């Protein structure tokens, strides 16, 4: 399975950008309240609709941060299942397709534990200081579950659009 991911937030940022799906422009949503930065490039999978009503979120492992709006052809290796104040907010963990440095990463088991722990720590705590926001459940699942969620999100998009 391969798909395009639109990067919204580069690794290392505290600015939370979002693509305005009506205009196609990148908008500053907020500056994170917690003194933490995004641990990977963050964006969404094109032509999907997640459980939260937004395109399905994606995390892309890259050696250098990209710019908001850049498309990356990616493949899933796992997924971070997360529930926040709006409900399900899963994030598909991906690697770029056309970069042989990632050929050895086939599933979540191949991603270094420290990397997974750092990503989990960020998403469990990044809303801690924001009034009315929270994360109440979060854990990693494998590639098969990630691919199934991508497929469900594609079907939701086709049924309802965005």
From Swiss-Prot:
UniProt KW DNA damage keyword: no
Annotated compartments: Cytoplasm
GO MF annotation list: inorganic diphosphate phosphatase activity; magnesium ion binding
GO BP, sorted A to Z: phosphate-containing compound metabolic process
Keyword annotations: Cytoplasm, Hydrolase, Magnesium, Metal-binding
Assembly behavior: Homohexamer.
Required cofactor names: Mg(2+)
Active site: 89 (proton acceptor)
Chain's role: Catalyzes the hydrolysis of inorganic pyrophosphate (PPi) forming two phosphate ions.
GO cellular component, one term: cytoplasm
Residues engaged in binding Mg(2+) 3: 84, 89
Pfam families, A to Z: Pyrophosphatase
Enzyme type, top EC level: hydrolase
Reactions catalysed according to its record: diphosphate + H2O = 2 phosphate + H(+)
Record: residues binding Mg(2+) 2: 8, 57
InterPro entries: Pyrophosphatase, Pyrophosphatase_sf
Residues holding Mg(2+) 1: 52, 57, 89
Gene from which this protein is expressed: ppa
Protein EC: 3.6.1.1
Residue intervals passing through the bilayer: none
Protein's recorded name: Inorganic pyrophosphatase
Family per record: Belongs to the PPase family.
